[in-house]
Every structure is written in C-alpha cells, then in structure tokens.
C-alpha cells in the first residue's frame, strides 16, 4: 500500500486555513479510497493513518472514531453535491427546464463508478453497522442532499406551477424516478453506465412522467 504523505507547513508553525483545508481533503481522499476498496468494516484506522502518513492519534483526535471519519466523508460529499445542485436550480426557468437539468446532473453523478461503489458499500455495511448512516439521514430530514430541489419544488407549488401534496416525498420520488432503475441495475452488475446520450434520454423521460402527475 502506497503512503500519501500529508505535507507539513514550510514555516514549522501553525498551518494556514488553506493549508489545513488541503491537508484535510487529502486525508479524506485517502480514507474514501480505502473505504471504497476494502469496505467499511475491513478498513482500520491503523491502515488509514499509515497510508495518509499521519499518527493514528491524529485521526482519533480529529474524528473521534472510524464512524466519525466516515460521517465526515459523507457530509463532505453532501455539501459538494448541494453546492452543485444550488448552482443548477434557477427559479426563473420553467419547471421542465429546471427538472431536466437536475435529472441530468443526478444521472451524471449518480452513475459514476465511484458513486456506485459508495452505494454498494452502504448497502453492504449499513445493516451490519447500526447507525452507520441513520444519523446522517435523520440529520438531513431524509432529503440527503436534495434540499435545493425540495426548495425549488416548494417554490413552484407556491407559484401555482406544480401541484404537490408532500414536497419531501415528491423530491424522493423524483430522485428514484430518475436514478433508481439504472442505479439498481448497475449495482447488480446487470448494466453498464449509460453514455451521455442515453443519460439525456433517461432524464427527459423521467421529467415527462413526473410532470404528468403534478403539472398544473
């Protein structure tokens, strides 16, 4: 296993805010790679510390436990996703345009090989490790990074553009309509990642079905 040294500051003093952020990101990259490669239960703090080139006590001091480190990785992914999604949602656009943009992004990100491996890890280990992701989902109110979409749908309902009785449920249904089928087949090894043209077709069809049930 190769070791990824986390660089120290040149001055020997406290790291700058940017240096600290860079070091944390490198550490999280190492941890994410090991979790995806070996699985949650088989990954140890010892192996993570060794590959990252840091002391094990540093990991425990920063994250508290392996579960805390994994939760930090999930939260970092969620924050990045939410930031990307917020940049895509333009409330002045028509619902069809906004939803197709979101659907395409869901398919582009959600069918990436590394994301499929993450889903597989969660499916395999979540029931073996109680609380592995339950607290994360509870903290996010069940939306798990889809808050910008929920906010948009709620605004569209208020504007009289869509008719939805339960926005959080509709948000979840939209995600599964877009991503659920192909992701399940990929997880089972029954399908390869669709190419860009196929992803665009899936996005358009999912949006048409969704709007057929809620457009005014």
Name each model-derived stretch.
Residues 71-102, 110, 114, 154-155:
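Amphipathic alpha-helical linker/stalk segments
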Residues 97, 117, 121, 131-158, ...:
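Amphipathic alpha-helical packing segments from all-alpha helical-bundle domains
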Residues 1-14, 101, 105, 147, ...:
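C-terminal peripheral helix-coil segments that are non-catalytic and often amphipathic
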Residues 163, 167-171:
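Membrane-interface starts of transmembrane alpha-helices
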Residues 110-137, 182-188:
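Amphipathic alpha-helical segments used for helix-helix packing
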Residues 40, 63, 123-129, 139-142:
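Short helix-capping/turn signature of helix-turn-helix
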Residues 1-38, 42-54, 61-62, 67-68, ...:
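Basic, helix-initiating cap at the start of DNA-binding domains
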